[in-house]
A protein has these predicted regions:
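Low-complexity, intrinsically disordered segments enriched in Ser/Thr together with acidic residues
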Residues: 321-339
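Exposed acidic/Ser/Thr-rich ligand/metal-binding surfaces
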Residues: 2-3, 22-29, 50-52, 66-72, ...
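Ser/Thr/Pro/Gly-rich low-complexity linker/stalk segments immediately outside membranes or between
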Residues: 26-41
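Extracellular adhesion/glycan-binding regions together with long Ser/Thr-
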Residues: 301-325
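Short aromatic-acidic-glycine turn motif
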Residues: 149-153, 293-301, 354-358
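Hydrophobic membrane-insertion alpha-helices, especially the h-region
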Residues: 8-20
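Long, acidic serine/threonine- and proline-rich intrinsically disordered regions
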Residues: 19-30, 334-495
Length: 495
């Protein structure tokens, strides 16, 4: 800390409270490669080894963490509510000399509904992924109907084994029912005991589970178990008759992605996207810890699995690929207090660095200014406002899906319209802030597009004169497709 800063604080007669002491505790896990940068609202820093606290910060190297408070200045003399946002990202500049080894399970639905072109396209997409794997990667192939069959046990890729795995894919035939939970159990076993690798399941289905586990909560528990073992599951729903709630839940709880493929011809693109992300993975076992200052309370954690231990929120974030970002949003209650700087939270990010081949970490701290001067109060940070909008938009899409499934089409559209109005209000407020940037505007644009597509997709034109009565909206192909598109959009917005 600068001598001038010490003198100024002494001249003002300020003393350190217990909260201030908390905020200045040294952080042993600070990554020496990762400088901390941010805007003003700086509290005294007694030494160069300690993080500076402020209303926003960015820290890290291979993987970065950006922390932001929704409101940098809050009203004195009353309880306040604000948001904390953490963005975990790799900008693509850090690259390993060679890709991290992959431990992949390809899981394909072979129930009767997959016959024909769907199965052909699924097999071809999987073959493309096998062809792109590096020597030393490990792959398993599982096909499932009423039960799961491991067609290829965990196999290390070389030129001979690559051909054998490809031939095994050609032998998949569509028959029987659908047991997704059986397939996930088999994938979990196939991926076991492979330390130092990036573990991924690519699960494809076109239908409802008709055998085994059938409830969303059961799949959430199963997916959490896989996540805790370092396994993420990316789910691919084909056509319009699969259960989007189950596939979304699997992906969300395991830190994977969810895809909707209306036309099976697009499967190759999805498989390519997944394998490119795997090849560009720079970190695994990534975990955020948000250590709240005394008195700060959690009101809600949005969109992500977490556990709370005292004042600490522990949030697993899975793998991070170059160019990828993942976010955490938390609504906080800040109790009334005296004017001055108020510590809010420390944020620590820890991960297995696949570029430097070591454990990596970085951190920073967030603090707000408590003021009785109304002129100093700040509107919500535009990036936080956009992220709040994403959670609200994702929820509105899911709410609209539920209403639509009940045949309450007008109510579904009203829910979407109401969220669009709220989104426009948030955007207008954000645009007035001095640090508004095009990136935040693009975030709002993406949400607006998702809401517009949903409203349009749910619209049901009246049948022409003399035509037979139309099917109920939820039973039409258009309605089913829009419901699944909404679920995919919601999963992406919440990521």
């Amino acid at each position: 800390m600068k001598v001038g800063t010490v003198g100024l604080l002494a001249a003002l007669g300020m003393t350190l409270t217990s909260v201030s002491v908390w905020s200045l505790t040294p952080e042993a896990s600070q990554d020496p490669q990762g400088p901390v940068v941010g805007s003003d609202l700086v509290v005294a820093d007694p030494g160069p080894a300690q993080p500076v606290i402020r209303a926003d910060f960015t820290a890290g190297s291979t993987v970065m963490v950006e922390g932001r408070l929704g409101n940098g200045v809050m009203q004195a003399g009353r309880d306040n509510e604000t948001y904390l946002m953490a963005r975990v990202f790799a900008d693509g500049s850090a690259r390993a000399s060679e890709a991290a080894p992959v431990n992949l399970a390809i899981v394909i639905d072979r129930s009767g509904s997959m016959k024909g072109k769907r199965m052909e396209n699924a097999i071809n997409a999987a073959k493309g992924t096998i062809a792109a794997l590096n020597r030393g990667d490990v792959v398993s192939v599982i096909a499932y109907d009423a039960e799961a069959e491991t067609l290829v046990q965990a196999t290390t890729i070389d030129e001979i084994s690559r051909q054998r795995v490809t031939e095994a894919l050609s032998n998949i035939r569509a028959i029987g029912d659908t047991c997704i939970s059986c397939a996930m159990d088999a994938a979990e076993r196939a991926l076991a005991n492979r330390d130092g690798m990036v573990n991924r399941v690519m699960l494809l289905t076109d239908g409802e589970p008709t055998r085994g586990m059938k409830d969303v909560s059961g799949f959430e528990r199963m997916s959490s178990r896989l996540r805790d073992k370092g396994i993420s599951v990316s789910t691919i729903g084909v056509d319009v008759d699969y259960n989007e709630r189950i596939l979304s839940a699997i992906a969300r709880e395991s830190n994977g992605r969810h895809y909707f493929v209306e036309n099976a011809d697009s499967l190759t693109k999805i498989f390519e996207e997944e394998r490119n992300a795997l090849k560009q993975t720079v970190a695994k076992d990534t975990e955020l810890v948000v250590d709240l200052a005394p008195g700060i309370r959690v009101e809600k954690v949005f969109d992500r699995a977490f556990r709370q231990e005292g004042n600490k929120l522990i949030v697993p974030m899975g793998t991070v690929s170059g160019g990828e970002e993942k976010t955490l949003l938390v609504r906080l209650s800040v109790p009334r207090g005296a004017e001055g700087e108020r510590a809010v939270a420390k944020i620590d990010l820890a991960y297995q660095d696949l570029v430097e081949r070591r454990r990596g970490s970085c951190n920073g701290e967030l603090a707000a200014l408590i003021s009785s001067d109304p002129a100093k109060l700040t509107p919500m940070d535009p990036f936080v406002a956009a992220r709040v909008g994403r959670s609200e938009t994702a929820q509105s899409l899911l709410d609209a899906n539920a209403l639509f499934a009940q045949g309450r089409v007008e109510e579904a559209q009203k829910r979407l319209t109401a969220q669009l109005e709220e989104l426009n209000r948030r955007r207008a407020e954000a645009q007035k802030t001095p640090n508004f940037e095009p990136k935040a505007d693009k975030d709002f644009d993406k949400q607006e597009a998702a809401l517009g597509a949903a409203n349009s997709g749910f619209a049901q034109p009246p049948p022409p004169p003399g035509a037979a009565p139309a099917k109920p909206a939820p039973e039409t192909r258009k309605g089913k497709a829009q419901t699944r598109s909404n679920a995919e959009a919601a999963a992406d917005l919440a990521f």
